[in-house]
Design a protein with these regions (language model features):
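Charge-dense, helix-prone N-terminal extensions
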Residues: 1-112
Length: 112
């Protein structure tokens, strides 16, 4: 999977838009970061993943999930896109989208 593929499906969701963060491509919802591409052009910085869940993900699939010391104290997991499939990325991205999108948009999504 590539960031462009992630971008294509995420931009179909209401309130998602292209942006940049730390000089890299990013996806934003109402000006808040949904996810961004790391400088290595292969890792997705996935926000909204609690540390205990991150540990479980890494333990179960270390070829896909990882983190660096920089992210140790944050609810973030890194996803190696070259090893990931949409079925891995989309649920985490959608969950974080739900926390950033307006209540109205989330309600409309749930009702559709």
């Amino acid at each position: 999977m590539t960031f462009d593929e992630v971008r294509k499906f995420a931009l179909l969701w209401d309130e998602v838009e292209d942006g940049t963060s730390y000089g890299t491509p990013a996806l934003k919802v109402r000006k808040k970061l949904l996810a961004r591409l790391r400088e290595d052009n292969d890792s997705l910085v996935m926000f909204g993943v609690p540390q205990d869940e991150r540990e479980m993900l890494i333990e179960g699939q270390s070829k896909i999930y990882y983190f660096t010391d920089h992210y140790r104290d944050y609810p973030i997991v890194l996803i190696r896109l070259s090893n990931a499939k949409r079925a891995i990325v989309e649920p985490l991205l959608r969950r974080h989208w739900r926390t950033l999108a307006s209540k109205k948009v989330v309600k409309e999504f749930d009702e559709s």
